[in-house]
Design a protein with these regions (language model features):
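Non-catalytic pre-domain segments flanking phosphatase-related domains
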Residues: 1-17, 239-246
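N-terminal helical cap/lid subdomain that shapes the substrate entry/recognition surface
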Residues: 10-116
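Substrate-recognition/cap helix-loop segment adjacent to the acidic, metal-dependent catalytic center
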Residues: 39-41, 69-74, 99, 107-121, ...
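Short acidic capping loops at alpha-helix termini that bridge into adjacent secondary structure
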Residues: 46-49, 142-146, 174-179, 198
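Structural recognition of alpha->loop->beta junctions
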Residues: 139-149, 211-229
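Conserved Lys-Pro-Asp/Glu-containing loop-to-beta segment of HAD-superfamily phosphomonoesterases
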Residues: 157-188
Length: 246
């Protein structure tokens, strides 16, 4: 449970883990839900507006879904809210039809962390309603200590509020005892801004290694399955050169 950091030793006591693309392999589901949502507002496939909207969606992954739609419909709050509602219904419907599947090794990683007394907080840009649906589908009540969405903390990513809320709620004494893991640039920004010692980008989701490093990743992992090896000891994973502190 110790990680060399800045010449000293930090004990990791909390892992804040992103949901979509990190702990659950639902990237295609999420993309389809975004596409359906903007189509209901008149932005349809095959148009330049659709292409621009989906580029915005990709760049904004990890941020609160309502904020993604506000970026697409900046002058029409009602339209953004309507699109967000369609997104939630589409995504939740997909969960009901197909279920959710974590990437290989994810469940085992959670179990190893919990066995080592590392607390687990799941974080997301989804609404509380959608988060509750995801948690029900996963049946992970015995594997996580807390699950937060933006409305639980104040602001969503790339702000650090969810990480800091988890620190307070779970009684962590020092933000340096936190590891933040995600698949998007906004996850990395949030982790760095929170002061977490470990901000690890995983390659199972939406953004490339380069984007994750741009966001300030301290480590790059193939998947969440590698996290116990990083924070619990054993083989050391080197920090990537060039990770920016933001």
């Amino acid at each position: 449970m110790v990680l060399a950091h800045g010449g000293g030793v930090t004990t990791i006591k909390l892992a804040c883990l992103d949901l979509a693309g990190t702990t659950i392999g639902d990237i295609a589901m999420v993309e389809r839900a975004f596409a359906e949502a903007i189509a209901t507002q008149g932005i349809v496939p095959g148009t330049g507006a659709y292409a621009r909207a989906m580029v915005h969606v990709h760049r904004s992954r990890g941020c609160p879904t309502i904020e993604v739609f506000r970026g697409i419909f900046p002058d029409n709050e009602a339209q953004a809210q309507a699109a967000n509602l369609t997104f939630e219904r589409s995504y939740e419907g997909a969960i009901g039809r197909a279920g959710l599947t974590p990437p290989p090794g994810t469940v085992e990683a959670l179990e190893k962390l919990r066995a080592a007394d590392v607390k687990i907080c799941l974080t997301t840009g989804f609404s509380r309603t959608t988060l509750s649906r995801v948690l029900t589908a996963l049946s992970w009540s015995d594997k996580v200590d807390l699950a937060l969405c933006p409305e639980d903390a104040g602001r969503g990513r790339p702000m650090p509020d969810m990480v800091l809320a988890a620190v307070l709620r779970l009684g962590i004494e020092d933000v340096r005892q936190v590891a933040v893991v995600g698949d998007s640039e906004s996850d990395m920004l949030s982790g760095r801004r929170s002061g977490a010692s470990v901000v690890a980008g995983v390659l199972t989701g939406v953004h490339s290694k380069e984007r994750l490093l741009k966001g300030g990743a301290t480590h790059i992992l193939d998947s969440l399955a590698d996290l116990p090896r990083l924070v619990l000891g054993g083989d050391r994973l080197e920090s990537p050169v060039g990770a920016s502190a933001l």
